[in-house]
Amino acid sequence: MFSQLLQLFPRSEFQMMVKETRSERHARGFSSWSQFVSMLFCQLGHAFSLREISGGLRSCEGKLKHLGISAPPRSTLGYANEHRPWELYQLIFLTLLDRCHNQVNLKKRKFRFKNPLVSLDSSFIDLCLEMYNWAHYRRTKGAVKLHLLLDHDGYLPSFAVITDGKVSDVEVARRFKFAPDTIVVDDRGYNDYDLFGKWTSEGVYFVTRMKDNAVYKVVKKNAVNAKRHILKDEIIKLSGPGASEKCPYQLRRIEFYNDEKQEILVFLTNHLKLAASTIAAIYKDRWRIETFFRDLKQNLKIKTFVGTSANAVKIQIWTALIAMLILRFLQLRSKFGWSLSNLVALLRMNLFTHRDFWAWLDQPFEVLPIPYDTEQLQFDLS
């Protein structure tokens, strides 16, 4: 079934990406395709080391012809991960993302508005500073940071950036280009009035939590619906030092009572027309990106690495994102109703099973007829 899964990556298209990134420059014998299949096997087969990747593939040597590879020596795979550009894997991810959007009827989100809705967040991936001395974050701690955009149509990642742990969320947020009318949901780590002013001038909406020490003046008070747990709905202008120059636009401050946690949440947005309860629901839906990070770390190999160089770590993270995209694509295509953890576990057990992959995806527990007569084995104990 692994070979059928790899048909999501046409070889001709893959080779074009190899040429674009010059991934096989000075390469001898070990192809970029073999490297990619090996690293994808690391994720889907849950291999913990180069030895397990090499040994796991070697134990299936007779079945690797269908994959177009041979089992690589661990030293060869380790060298390729250290020296071949990680940008190839980023390009594979973006290409697969387009294919997923084109081939799957994405499940519509619960909101009626037509604006594109994305969540923006980041997550630390801790590293041992003694082994990864390039990943300085704090004096005794190493880390890289995965910044992610999650599209709420289908809850697929739409873009990702991997940076050093020291890089701020706001710095990365400035790199993203959003289409006008897009609604960006983020947390207080992205509170930057210069960024909010930039987005507002470009016609991009944001929904976030307001800082407790924000200074503002109320321009207008809107009517509130207490039944929807809305306590206040105010049109405001920032009046703190420098804030009014960075973001001179009218904003909206909404106080919402969360009866589940019995706390008051204060939202800040530049969308002046949506209902206050809708703004609160939009922010609540941001938990999807936190769930994505949790699933990524729990089900794929992203907390321990098979290489120690920055290039090898990035290749493994991008491969994990590719694997996650495959799994979400399979969930959306399947009629079975897989949970992610069950899909990961059963797929790992059946990677080299001879069966129609898409039939298995819809009916994983179907008992197939045995196509030939079997003879009972007998032991001569005399």
PLM segments and residue spans:
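Blade-loop segments of beta-propeller domains
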Residues: 60, 64-68
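Single, function-defining residue in the core of a domain
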Residues: 1-52, 56, 84, 91-95, ...
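Major-groove recognition helix of helix-turn-helix-like DNA-binding domains
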Residues: 67-84
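Active-site phosphate-binding and catalytic loops of NTP-dependent enzymes
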Residues: 104-107
